[in-house]
Amino acid sequence: MVCRFSYVQVVLILVVLSVIISWANACSCFPPDETRQQKCRRADFVFLGRGYVTGIQQIGSFFYLRYCFLIDRVFKDRASSLNIPCALTNVESSYCGVRFERGRRYIVSGYLTRSGNQIGACEWNERWSNVPFLTRLQLFNDPQWCLP
């Protein structure tokens, strides 16, 4: 009788836990320790500019923020992906979405997909004022710095 009672308790606890616990998503990048230059080299586009949100777009079951940019300088643009200077990023940071403060300058990099330009936390998207001076110097003075 005691054994049956323990079994019922364990089953009840497992049922309650399975209802309470939901799937959690987390952004994880691979490889995890890429340098700025490595991120720059694998991106389809890299530019310096100021972004502003122009809306939300749904693709499948995911929602994306659409940022458009006032571009100061283009460092890399494969396949003329910056003809339309806008890009999508996931609304959720747990899905590697990124945010840009309006009016601030950022280094922005990403990929051209069927849905348009995509940017995320695993690419080189960083406030320009946080980029080290030597990296800025290399980026501006060495045209090969971002090329594979």
UniProtKB/Swiss-Prot annotation:
Gene3D superfamilies: 2.40.50.120. Disulfide bonds join 27-96, 29-122, 40-146. It comes from Margaritifera margaritifera. One of its GO terms (biological process) is negative regulation of membrane protein ectodomain proteolysis. GO terms for molecular function: metalloendopeptidase inhibitor activity; protease binding. Prismatic layer of shell (at protein level). Expressed primarily in the mantle with highest level in the mantle edge and lower level in the mantle pallium. Residues 1-26 form the signal peptide. It comes from the Eukaryota. Pfam families: TIMP. GO terms for cellular component: extracellular matrix; extracellular space. InterPro entries: Netrin_domain, TIMP, TIMP-like_OB-fold. PROSITE patterns: NTR. This is NTR domain-containing protein. The keyword Disulfide bond applies. Keywords: Disulfide bond, Secreted, Signal. Residues 27-146 form the NTR domain. It is found in: Secreted. SUPFAM superfamilies: TIMP-like.
